[in-house]
């Protein structure tokens, strides 16, 4: 099977990163309220599992929500929710990946979750909760196929979209070479 730092389940820390993505401005009230409600559900679920959620926010609505409730936020990104720059996206991904790969004494997390809105149509936007890291290795046709595991919303989504397939990623030349590149 594939062995890579981003595919390894961590047991050396109970800290778990939760990135909450909302809008910066108030016109999208229901949009942000739904995301904040889903993030609270995820946080509650993680705490029930004995994990320590570490909150990251993208968007002023999320930042304000947690700040108003005196809930600590590890890092916030604001001002670009309508058109995120490549630099901000790189900063978010680098921050979360380095925290996942860090040592426990340096504030590592064992998982990275994201709560965001998936756009379906102009009228329909669906809140999504996904575990992004660690990637879960699934041997379907042999070694080297990866699938993202959507921990918190998996059962709900399967009932809602019974015929939807989980996204599979096939790496060529090999998954190990791609991940080590």
Predicted segments, located by residue:
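C-terminal beta-strand-loop-alpha-helix "lid" module of Rossmann-like NAD(P)-dependent dehydrogenases
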Residues: 1-181
């Amino acid at each position: 099977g594939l062995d890579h730092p981003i595919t390894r389940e961590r047991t050396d820390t109970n800290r778990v990163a939760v990135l909450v993505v909302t809008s910066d401005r108030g016109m999208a009230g229901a949009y942000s309220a739904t995301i904040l409600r889903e993030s609270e559900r995820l946080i509650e679920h993680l705490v029930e599992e004995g994990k320590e959620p570490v909150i990251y926010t993208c968007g002023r609505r999320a930042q304000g929500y947690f700040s108003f409730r005196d809930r600590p936020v590890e890092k916030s990104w604001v001002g670009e929710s309508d058109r995120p720059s490549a630099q901000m996206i790189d900063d978010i991904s680098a921050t979360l990946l380095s925290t996942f790969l860090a040592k426990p004494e340096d504030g590592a997390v064992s998982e990275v979750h994201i709560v965001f809105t998936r756009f379906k149509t102009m009228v329909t936007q669906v809140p999504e909760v996904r575990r992004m890291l660690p990637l879960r290795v699934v041997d379907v046709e042999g070694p080297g196929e990866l699938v993202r595991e959507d921990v918190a919303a998996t059962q709900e989504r399967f009932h809602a979209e019974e015929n939807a397939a989980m996204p599979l990623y096939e790496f060529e030349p090999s998954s190990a070479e791609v991940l080590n590149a």
